[in-house]
């Protein structure tokens, strides 16, 4: 990622990104070297600008109603190596270098519940670290 404010002001980018009516766009974070899908989150324009300028993933927390700088409380950061738009401009793919785990449950990926053919759900990966170790004794609520 280029760390320039000029990039965040690129008119072509703002014309290409199709935000929802409430000003958000879904974002998928994927580990750049393995292709592992780590998580899904949301960005508003401010979060996207900050991500472009800093090269670090910044999202919009719908539950908290504020910017969520990935790793600000856990230390589990995402360095953004590339940002891609899908064909419709309504979803962003971040290729990241994930430090530690991506999920607030302590798992590498948020996608650890596998749904079987009859609808049963099986947990396919165990936590690598406890939420308490990441966020302290008070734990962590969903971003």
Curated annotation (Swiss-Prot):
Taxonomically, the superkingdom here is: Bacteria
Q: Which SUPFAM superfamilies match?
A: HisI-like
Pathway info: Amino-acid biosynthesis; L-histidine biosynthesis; L-histidine from 5-phospho-alpha-D-ribose 1-diphosphate: step 3/9
**UniProt binding sites for Zn(2+):** 87, 103, 110
Which compartments is it annotated to reside in? Answer: Cytoplasm
Record's cofactor remark: Binds 1 Mg(2+) ion per subunit.
GO MF, one example: magnesium ion binding
Q: What is its main location?
A: cytoplasm
What this protein catalyses is:
1-(5-phospho-beta-D-ribosyl)-5'-AMP + H2O = 1-(5-phospho-beta-D-ribosyl)-5-[(5-phospho-beta-D-ribosylamino)methylideneamino]imidazole-4-carboxamide
Q: Which GO terms describe its biological process?
A: L-histidine biosynthetic process
EC code: 3.5.4.19
Summarize where Mg(2+) binds, as residue positions.
86, 88, 90
Cofactor or coenzyme needed? Mg(2+); Zn(2+)
Q: Which UniProt keywords apply?
A: Amino-acid biosynthesis, Cytoplasm, Histidine biosynthesis, Hydrolase, Magnesium, Metal-binding, Zinc
One GO cellular component assignment for this chain's record is: cytoplasm
Q: Record's family?
A: Belongs to the PRA-CH family.
Q: What does this protein do?
A: Catalyzes the hydrolysis of the adenine ring of phosphoribosyl-AMP.
NCBIfam families of this UniProt entry? PRK00051.1 (NF000768)
Instruction: State whether it acts alone or in a complex, and with which partners, per the record.
Output: Homodimer.
Stated name of the protein: Phosphoribosyl-AMP cyclohydrolase
**Origin organism lineage:** Bacteria, Pseudomonadati, Pseudomonadota, Alphaproteobacteria, Rhodospirillales
């Amino acid at each position: 990622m280029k760390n320039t404010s000029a990039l965040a002001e690129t008119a072509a980018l703002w014309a290409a990104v199709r935000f929802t009516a409430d000003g958000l766009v879904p974002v998928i974070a994927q580990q750049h070297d393995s292709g592992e899908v780590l998580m899904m989150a949301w960005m508003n324009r401010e979060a996207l600008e900050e991500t472009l300028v800093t090269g670090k993933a910044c999202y919009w927390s719908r539950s908290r109603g504020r910017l969520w700088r990935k790793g600000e409380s856990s230390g589990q950061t995402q360095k953004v190596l590339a940002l891609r738009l899908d064909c419709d401009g309504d979803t962003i793919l971040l290729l990241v270098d994930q430090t530690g785990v991506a999920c607030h449950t302590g798992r590498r990926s948020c996608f650890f519940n596998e749904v079987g053919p009859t609808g049963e759900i099986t947990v396919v990966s165990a936590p690598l670290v406890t939420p308490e170790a990441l966020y302290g004794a008070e734990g962590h609520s969903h971003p």
